[in-house]
């Protein structure tokens, strides 16, 4: 097997069937994720997204098949390499309350470092650094359960960052936040990804969130329907419909305008820019 040097994740022929289930939850899925990029796995409820997240760090093990491969950062996932993989892959779940273990924010963020027997002075400096990166320095003595939903997610992300993972999986981790909170966390993730050269694999049923990614994987009933850039994925309206999803608002409006013969320049690629462009067009008429 030859791995593409620039892919941090290579998945081939991945299938998984839950015990007592007749139908596989994940069916012969193959994809790769280039290092330092953001990939979003999108699919409706029950399409198999969380199962794939759990397979990627060995919480679940794939169905037996000699052709199946999960390779992360050059390490092929087996029962033996599971702990090496877990050091490289951090998962932030939907409900951060289930992840907190420390009485205070700083204790919580330090937890993974304590487990890895990191010396105290180094631990303190890492905790300060990651709390600073997620904008939570002022809350280090707070009890995690009394924080807002967005603040809790920041602390959960800091705890994962502290371990120094190569890949961060975000499993519906903004789904409990209001739109403004969601946007702030997505912006933070993009910032962290760029500053730390991290690879992000986010999982969502919210198609609007998928717009932020470099690559989108579309999952339906356990099968991968497509993998491409957001622009190319959202060109294919029938693909999105077949996956039981809806187009993001920006693409809906853009497609309607194109159908009415109004061409939209490529650089007009956000709702904000589209509104500005239409106002300019209107003032010229
Ligand atoms: N522990 C389990 N035992 C048996 N079946 C399961 C288990 N967990 C999930 N499933 C089934 O596997 C399929 C995929 O579930 P999964 O949670 O991966 O989907 P999902 O896309 O993450 O859904 P959601 O968006 O609702 O979280 C579903 O049919 C689900 O009912």
Curated annotation (Swiss-Prot):
GO terms for molecular function: ATP binding; ATP hydrolysis activity; ATPase-coupled transmembrane transporter activity. It comes from the Bacteria. Its EC number is 7.-.-.-. Residues 9-246 form the ABC transporter domain. One of its GO terms (cellular component) is ATP-binding cassette (ABC) transporter complex. It is an enzyme of class 7 (translocase). It is found in: Cell membrane. SUPFAM superfamilies: P-loop containing nucleoside triphosphate hydrolases (SSF52540). The keyword Nucleotide-binding applies. ATP binds at residues 43-50. The keyword Transit peptide does not apply. Keywords: ATP-binding, Cell membrane, Membrane, Nucleotide-binding, Translocase, Transport. It is a peripheral membrane protein. Belongs to the ABC transporter superfamily. Energy-coupling factor EcfA family. ATP-binding (A) component of a common energy-coupling factor (ECF) ABC-transporter complex. Unlike classic ABC transporters this ECF transporter provides the energy necessary to transport a number of different substrates. Forms a stable energy-coupling factor (ECF) transporter complex composed of 2 membrane-embedded substrate-binding proteins (S component), 2 ATP-binding proteins (A component) and 2 transmembrane proteins (T component). This is Energy-coupling factor transporter ATP-binding protein EcfA1. It comes from Lactobacillus gasseri (strain ATCC 33323 / DSM 20243 / BCRC 14619 / CIP 102991 / JCM 1131 / KCTC 3163 / NCIMB 11718 / NCTC 13722 / AM63). The lineage of its organism: Bacteria, Bacillati, Bacillota, Bacilli, Lactobacillales.
